[in-house]
């Protein structure tokens, strides 16, 4: 479990440190976001049904990350956002494992996360910095569906 938490923290720290970049996602000079436009999604008014799973994830993450001899600063919401974005590109056993850790399938989690962020009024402030960074590699194939889902929800 500690190895899983370390992996999750690495993803989130990387997403946090690199998340302030531009909206241009490119590999080998090709803009992967060509043809990808954010579609407005419906905001779920009542998030309570799946809030138990999100809270459970948060508690499990904090329990696994806390040691009496250390001070830990951790945002379960940021971790969940980073994992949710990543899970949209996973499939098979990897996706199943990620959904098990997160407590919800990505098809449920995507609209929940979108709605959570959009529930705040204009005079309240909650900003998250999310980004997807890819290693430039000629063998890398980035599916348009992955980019579209993340553009729409995150």
Segments and roles (model prediction):
Residues 5-9, 16, 20-154:
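Extended, solvent-exposed regulatory segments
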């Amino acid at each position: 479990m500690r190895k899983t938490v370390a992996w999750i923290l690495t993803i989130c720290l990387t997403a946090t440190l690199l998340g302030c970049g531009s909206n241009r996602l490119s590999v080998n000079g090709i803009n992967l976001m060509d043809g990808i436009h954010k579609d407005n999604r419906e905001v779920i008014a009542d998030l309570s049904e799946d809030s138990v799973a999100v809270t459970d994830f948060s508690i499990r993450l904090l329990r696994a990350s806390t040691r009496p001899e250390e001070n830990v600063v951790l945002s379960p919401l940021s971790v969940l956002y980073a994992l949710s974005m990543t899970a949209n590109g996973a499939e098979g056993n990897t996706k199943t494992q990620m959904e098990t850790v997160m407590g919800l399938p990505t098809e449920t989690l995507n609209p929940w996360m979108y709605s959570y962020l959009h529930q705040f009024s204009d005079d309240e402030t909650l900003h998250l910095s999310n980004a997807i960074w890819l290693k430039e590699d000629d063998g890398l194939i980035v599916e348009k569906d992955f980019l579209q889902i993340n553009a729409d929800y995150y």
